[in-house]
């Protein structure tokens, strides 16, 4: 049964060809390609197309666009016992996501099984049927490890997806649907080991089995593709600047195994940027198109509670003092965002930059322009958090409406 399912999925994904990309993008013969990546996308209103009015034309001019899907897409919802804050949307939102220019979605989210296995499988099915590439999740462990290798004008790009923020039972196993895992292990070590009750240092490490599998997958992808991109749903949400140890380990090991670019998401705020061995790591791309919490109407009805008054929401807001001063659902730095950009030439990444962006009231994200105070705010914020993690923001150079990294 599993073999037939895997073969059907591979056949369906192979039918999504470069010709399908060209049908909705302005592809011309050119000497370089553009890859774009965003953080979390979670849509919760009637007119889904409204979200992308400010970025649609730019995204459709790119050759390949990646996004992180943050919500379950199904009308068959039953809250999982592990769900903290359920996130769902109607499957029709994929029409707007595709129309906006997205080509690849990771579903390696901590919300992937918020509404159980049926809704999870519905989401996978709808993504594939929409003609979008899927990475990071599957109907079982073998399928969850599959990743698309996309032929873009003769350049093959592999996009691998992993999830680290995994409630119990959310990672895929041999006969269990779920996320392709890149779990972390936490150790708490007392600062003064001889005095019980003293504060502790926190260390995190990659799960050894997941790390080995990730390295093997990247090495395998290296033999199939010209460009290998790794996507991780990881980190600590809402905690300014902080990068955990396990994130750095996974990112560095991925690059050592052959990855050309690492992109992170989940934290709902921007995180630092690192250049390691000449390769760029975006530790967190932040929210890209996320509806305000008070508008998660269907999820609140299913839970029978306003999310903002729930215990899980109170626990989340305790992580950051920024929740105390915000005038919106999330801390104000959650609305500073970016689009990661890579230029590919002669089957290599020859340049990486980011485009400052902002998520305003109304959730219609726009790209900032030089002279816009939000442009400067994003640039200064990224410089600050990067320096806070002992990384070098001095390499970032503003060039027109983007910030060059390499």
Predicted regions and their residues:
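Acidic, metal/ion-coordinating pockets
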Residues: 2-406
């Amino acid at each position: 049964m599993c073999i037939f399912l895997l073969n059907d999925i591979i056949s369906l994904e192979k039918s999504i060809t470069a010709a399908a990309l060209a049908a909705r993008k302005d592809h011309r013969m050119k000497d370089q390609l553009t890859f774009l990546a965003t953080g979390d996308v979670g849509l919760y209103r009637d007119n889904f197309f409204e979200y992308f009015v400010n970025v649609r034309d730019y995204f459709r001019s790119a050759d390949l666009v990646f996004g992180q899907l943050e919500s379950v897409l199904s009308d068959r919802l039953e809250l999982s016992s592990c769900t903290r804050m359920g996130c769902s949307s109607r499957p029709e939102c994929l029409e707007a996501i595709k129309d906006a220019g997205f080509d690849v979605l990771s579903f390696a989210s901590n919300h992937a099984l918020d509404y159980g296995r049926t809704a999870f499988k519905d989401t996978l099915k709808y993504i594939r049927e929409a003609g979008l590439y899927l990475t990071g999740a599957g109907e079982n462990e073998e399928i969850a490890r599959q990743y698309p290798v996309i032929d873009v004008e003769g350049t093959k790009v592999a996009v691998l997806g992993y999830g680290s923020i995994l409630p119990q039972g959310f990672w895929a196993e041999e006969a269990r649907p779920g996320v392709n895992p890149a779990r972390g292990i936490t150790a708490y070590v007392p600062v003064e080991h001889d005095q019980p009750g003293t504060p502790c240092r926190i260390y995190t490490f990659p799960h050894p089995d997941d790390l080995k599998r990730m390295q093997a997958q990247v090495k395998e992808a290296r033999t199939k593709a010209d460009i290998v991109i790794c996507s991780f749903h990881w980190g600590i949400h809402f905690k300014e600047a902080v990068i955990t140890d396990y994130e750095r380990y996974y990112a560095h090991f991925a690059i050592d195994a052959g990855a050309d670019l690492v992109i992170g998401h989940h934290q709902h705020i921007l995180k630092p940027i690192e250049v390691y061995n000449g390769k760029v790591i975006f530790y967190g791309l932040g929210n890209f198109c996320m509806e305000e919490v008070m508008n998660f109407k269907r999820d609140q009805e299913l839970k029978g509670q306003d999310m903002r008054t729930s215990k899980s929401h109170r626990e989340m807001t305790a992580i950051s003092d920024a929740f105390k001063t915000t005038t919106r659902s999330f801390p104000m730095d959650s609305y500073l965002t970016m689009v990661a950009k890579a230029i590919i030439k002669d089957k290599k990444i020859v340049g990486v930059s980011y485009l400052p962006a902002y998520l305003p009231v109304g959730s219609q994200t726009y790209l900032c322009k030089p002279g816009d105070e939000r442009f400067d705010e994003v640039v200064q914020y990224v410089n600050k958090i990067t320096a806070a993690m002992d990384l070098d923001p001095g390499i970032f150079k503003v060039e027109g409406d983007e910030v060059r990294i390499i």
